[in-house]
């Protein structure tokens, strides 16, 4: 199962892609940050985030998208941009018929470190260790996106409409979706040299 994690943000939106194999074996595929410039208008910033997220979903064809659940913060401008970016991630996934799960930061910390109150550096170190990376992913948005993907692999209970989507697909749509997933997996394995 390929899982794309999203740490939503208007200036920096973290994207992490992993593969969850048998026996909870997790493999790193990709990490990046989709950026928008604070010097352009809000609508164009949102478009940049949406286009970046759409490109990642088309490129990696995930089986699930795991997004950080947004909570109200003291800074309304920050929470508004974060909520808008989360909505764009949900929209991009829905347009591709990819199930979405929302996970709180506490859930992700608990899944990764065993401690829901873990510090950011502890989460980053565990993400690095779990995925056998040679160095910690940077910036923090990238590490958080990988943490959300790992969280979903280990604790998929946050899924929204998980099984319903398959029921609404025709047989031809299911075959097409399966073929697209297999093609993407072959390309990813080829890129990895497997």
From Swiss-Prot:
Chain positions recorded as Mg(2+) 1 binding sites: 7, 141
CC cofactor note: Binds 2 Mg(2+) ion per subunit.
A molecular function (GO) term: crossover junction DNA endonuclease activity
Residues forming the catalytic site: 7, 68, 141
First-listed, main subcellular location of the protein, grouped into a coarse class: cytoplasm
Cofactor(s) required, per the database record: Mg(2+)
Biological process, per Gene Ontology: DNA recombination; DNA repair
Coiled coil ranges: none
One Pfam family per UniProt: RuvC
Amino acids binding Mg(2+) 2: 68
Intracellular or extracellular location(s): Cytoplasm
Gene Ontology CC terms, in alphabetical order: cytoplasm; Holliday junction resolvase complex
Reaction(s) this enzyme catalyzes, per UniProt: Endonucleolytic cleavage at a junction such as a reciprocal single-stranded crossover between two homologous DNA duplexes (Holliday junction)
Keywords from the UniProt entry: Cytoplasm, DNA damage, DNA recombination, DNA repair, DNA-binding, Endonuclease, Hydrolase, Magnesium, Metal-binding, Nuclease
EC number from the UniProt entry: 3.1.21.10
Biological function: The RuvA-RuvB-RuvC complex processes Holliday junction (HJ) DNA during genetic recombination and DNA repair. Endonuclease that resolves HJ intermediates. Cleaves cruciform DNA by making single-stranded nicks across the HJ at symmetrical positions within the homologous arms, yielding a 5'-phosphate and a 3'-hydroxyl group; requires a central core of homology in the junction. The consensus cleavage sequence is 5'-(A/T)TT(C/G)-3'. Cleavage occurs on the 3'-side of the TT dinucleotide at the point of strand exchange.
Family listed: Belongs to the RuvC family.
Subunit: Homodimer which binds Holliday junction (HJ) DNA. The HJ becomes 2-fold symmetrical on binding to RuvC with unstacked arms; it has a different conformation from HJ DNA in complex with RuvA. In the full resolvosome a probable DNA-RuvA(4)-RuvB(12)-RuvC(2) complex forms which resolves the HJ.
Annotated protein name in UniProt: Crossover junction endodeoxyribonuclease RuvC
Originating species: Bifidobacterium longum (strain NCC 2705)
